Amino acid sequence: MSEIAKRLNQCRKPTGDLGKIVVEDMNESHFNLTSWGLEKIKIENNFLVLDIGCGGGKTVNRMAERADQGKVYGMDYSDDCVKWSIDFNMDLIKENKVEIFQGTVENIPFEAEKFDLITAVETIYFWPDIKANFSEVRRVLKTGGTFAIINEMYESEVFSDRNTEFAAIGNMNILSPEELKIILSEVGFNNIEIDLVEEKNWLRCVCNK
């Protein structure tokens, strides 16, 4: 297996020593992307927030600073990521402002209408059934709540060679903005707004239940 294939597989489900390196790198390399992605998103200080695919836990940490009277939950299906994210957020966990747990987007372990905001940063490429998974996200989101998707890649002619290679090697589903909007609309999301940074191939999608 090539080095790029190994890395993309670790992005899907980071594990072991290589996974820890990848997660630590993502905590740093995704900082600017996440800053741009979150700048448009309202986070009230009493919000209940769920970050799906929390990885190393830095995005959870940043949102917990804004929801300082609420709580931010981080979910990842990698047991190792859960452990690393707990370590990164231990002080906030002790203050009951953060909770990290193992879970999958196919069956989010919360009641309906739970969260004010749900985020997915650099993760939906790997979701097994995107339409069903978006429906599950919508189930646990409060009516009027916000679902935010932040991606470093979307289907684009400018980046088609790179993205096609990554999709094939990493078994990634890289959607176009139009495809993403259609699927979200079909499962019942509304007020769908998509912003792009075309020269970087960045995408931010914000929608409501």
Where are the language model's segments positioned?
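A generic alpha-to-beta junction signature in SAM-dependent methyltransferases
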Residues: I41-I43, R66-A67, L141
